[in-house]
Amino acid sequence: MLTKCEGIVLRTNDYGETNKIVTLLTREHGKIGVMARGARKSASRLSAVSQPFLYGSFLMQRTSGLGTLQQGEMILSMRTIREDLFLTAYAAFIAELTDKGTEEKKPNPYLFELILESFKRLNDGTDPDVITFIVQMKMLGVMGLYPELNHCVHCKSGEGTFHFSIRDNGFICHRCFEKDPYRVPMSPQTARLLRLFYYFDIGRLGSVSLKQETKNEIKRVIDLYYEEYSGLYLKSKRFLDQMESMKNLLDENKS
């Protein structure tokens, strides 16, 4: 059956000498894989529309297994991302997290809009750390993970100083600190931002400027939580961490 839909290219894998298997995130059908015959040839009409992170309109032959991509039309190329090594690292991480954190053929229009908006924001110059934090927090619910971010996991108080208890799955207040000696310290601002990123509509995001210290705290909480609960190993995460270390080193040398 021929189907036309909009999609985001999450991943491509070479298949044979001339073909690609393209993994698309679509609004109507969720995550699907399609064979793009001849897409490895530079002159192929499918080559341009099977680039990572591209947002396009696709005509495909759908089957119960791997579909076949017939044609495509670019809507947004996300060219700025692909031409910047640092932005590519962030986008590749978001794409792999989306790919490995979702099941095939399970439509989720909310997730589609989240990933599309995150790539648009990366392409337009929004702080990539902030975009990545938002996607990571919102992907938790997609994967069935629901940390308690509104009050203390023990006494249920919504007031006080909060740290994060990885073991107990959420915020822990100063009155209950002794119940988890391995809790992760964080500032009140970090606690507010974790909650904000979890609930906030990324489409409403304005200009955000975070201190590196705050970013480091957020990153530590999210990384530890994913390590404990997600069950995911993402190759792109290691690459992104290496790129961030390189960027921080370059920034230090400039100053």
Swiss-Prot record:
Q: Output the Gene Ontology cellular-component terms.
A: bacterial nucleoid
In the record, biological process GO terms are: DNA recombination; double-strand break repair
Instruction: Tell me the organism.
Output: Bacillus velezensis (strain DSM 23117 / BGSC 10A6 / LMG 26770 / FZB42)
Gene expressing this chain: recO
Q: What protein am I looking at?
A: DNA repair protein RecO
| UniProt family annotation | Belongs to the RecO family.
The record ties this protein, via NCBIfam families, to: reco
Q: Give UniProt keywords alphabetically.
A: DNA damage, DNA recombination, DNA repair
Biological function: Involved in DNA repair and RecF pathway recombination.
